[in-house]
């Protein structure tokens, strides 16, 4: 069972269940669950609750996914997001062109870093370039 956050046609943002094929959503509010966010729902989505939800969605119509705007699953994380720098070396090589001293040491270990997020950009969403700060 896959959970998403979506903006409904009336503009309300609601956690929802995404169908197996990714073409339909069932807002949790339609199932009588009044969680404002997916973060609020997660602690209560026990295996028993998920099994009950699976039965419930089998009996009610869904919204086509094209009728909603998919958001980030957790649009406003309560904490910093921890990231794994898989492509750290590529960034290091690129940054070394600008400051060889700062990136002269090559790291072989995994690089973790955190990001502050006020609101996560949804899949396919616009990422502001901050052209006043950077050129590329």
Give the positions of each predicted feature.
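N-terminal non-catalytic cap/leader segment that marks the start of a structured domain
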Residues: 1-106, 110-111
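Active-site glycine-rich loop that binds ribose-phosphate moieties when present
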Residues: 120-134
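A short catalytic or substrate-binding loop motif that flags glycine-/basic-rich loops and adjacent residues
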Residues: 8-10, 119, 136
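A gly/proline- and charged-residue-enriched helix-loop-helix capping module
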Residues: 104-124
């Amino acid at each position: 069972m896959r959970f998403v956050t979506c903006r409904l046609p009336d503009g309300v943002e609601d956690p929802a269940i995404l169908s197996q094929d990714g073409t339909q959503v069932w807002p949790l509010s339609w199932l009588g669950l009044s969680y404002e966010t997916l973060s609020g729902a997660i602690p209560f989505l026990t295996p028993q609750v998920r099994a009950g939800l699976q039965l419930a969605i089998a009996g009610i119509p869904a919204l086509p996914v094209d009728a909603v705007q998919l958001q980030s699953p957790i649009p406003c994380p309560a904490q910093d997001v921890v990231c794994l720098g898989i492509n750290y070396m590529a960034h290091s090589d690129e940054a070394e062109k600008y400051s060889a001293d700062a990136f002269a040491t090559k790291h072989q270990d995994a690089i973790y870093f955190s990001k502050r997020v006020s609101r996560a950009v949804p899949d396919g969403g616009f990422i502001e370039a901050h052209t006043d700060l950077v050129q590329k």
